[in-house]
UniProtKB/Swiss-Prot annotation:
Belongs to the GGGP/HepGP synthase family. Group II subfamily. GO terms for biological process: glycerophospholipid biosynthetic process. InterPro entries: GGGP/HepGP_synthase_I, GGGP/HepGP_synthase_sf, GGGP_HepGP_synthase, GGGP_synth. It catalyses: sn-glycerol 1-phosphate + (2E,6E,10E)-geranylgeranyl diphosphate = sn-3-O-(geranylgeranyl)glycerol 1-phosphate + diphosphate. This is Geranylgeranylglyceryl phosphate synthase. It holds the Pfam family PcrB. Its main location: cytoplasm. Pathway: Membrane lipid metabolism; glycerophospholipid metabolism. Its EC number is 2.5.1.41. GO terms for cellular component: cytoplasm. It comes from Pyrobaculum arsenaticum (strain DSM 13514 / JCM 11321 / PZ6).
């Protein structure tokens, strides 16, 4: 089973580890694995070199029995030590660089230097507050109250041919992507749907899980509260 097939089947929880913010990333990975996470995303910040990323991924894979997937915040965050990469295009960025510019350069790097990486083309759509991701990518986030706009982006992503769509409220967002927005996007986008940002309780995770996403992502909970992370993972699976 390849990575895309794995993501497509059922509903899963992934833990996002940002090695630039989490020095003790192995401890966080172990907490997440003990909590029952189904996969680990690595990346996010801008201050990670290619050699650092390779070491982090190899270290995590040495203790993980789940897929380790790149979530690159820059072109330097590529390594074929990972199981795959979310090849992100920030659809609601106001800067063409984040829609297609970085992707052109990244595609050449992957083809030449990391051909073993499984590439998952991913429409990245920033919602609500947007957090650091929205600020850095110069995005115009979709308001929480406008599922119709999110649906329009989802339809466009499907027609263009993206394999996955990631609804991102942003790290540390005051609230997550609303369940009604997830529901609307699920109806419009038949492929892999990922939702992340602002999910801090099992109740919120369950309400989102019931709307049919394939993957729900949480970040710092593994470090801040391993017990709460376990509750969230169970809520997602038992929805």
């Amino acid at each position: 089973m390849n990575l895309y097939e794995y993501l497509s089947q059922g509903i899963k929880h992934f833990t996002l580890i940002d090695p630039d913010k989490s020095v003790d990333y192995l401890r966080i990975a172990r907490y997440a694995l003990e909590a029952g996470t189904d996969g680990i995303l690595v990346g996010g910040s801008l201050g990670i070199t290619a050699s650092q990323m390779e070491k982090v991924v190899k270290d995590i894979k040495s203790v993980a029995n789940v897929p380790v997937v790149l979530f690159p915040g820059s072109l330097s965050q590529l390594t074929d030590a990972a199981d795959g990469v979310l090849f992100l295009s920030v659809l609601n960025s106001l800067d063409p660089y984040f829609i297609i510019g970085a992707q052109v350069h990244g595609a050449v790097l992957i083809a030449k230097h990391y051909p073993r990486l499984e590439v998952i083309s991913t429409a990245y759509v920033i919602v609500g507050d947007g957090g650091a991701a929205g600020f850095v990518s110069m995005s115009k986030p979709i308001p929480y109250t406008r599922p119709d706009i999110a649906t329009a982006y989802a339809l466009a992503a499907g027609y263009i041919g993206f394999k996955a769509l990631y609804l991102e409220a942003g790290s540390g967002a005051p609230q997550p992507v609303p369940p009604d927005m997830v529901r609307a996007v699920r109806k419009a986008f038949p492929r892999v749907l990922i939702v992340g940002g602002g999910i801090r309780s099992s109740e919120v995770a369950r309400s989102i899980a019931r709307e049919g996403p394939n993957v729900i992502v949480t970040g710092t909970l593994a470090e801040e509260s391993p017990e709460k992370l376990g509750e969230i993972v169970r809520a997602i699976k038992q929805r």
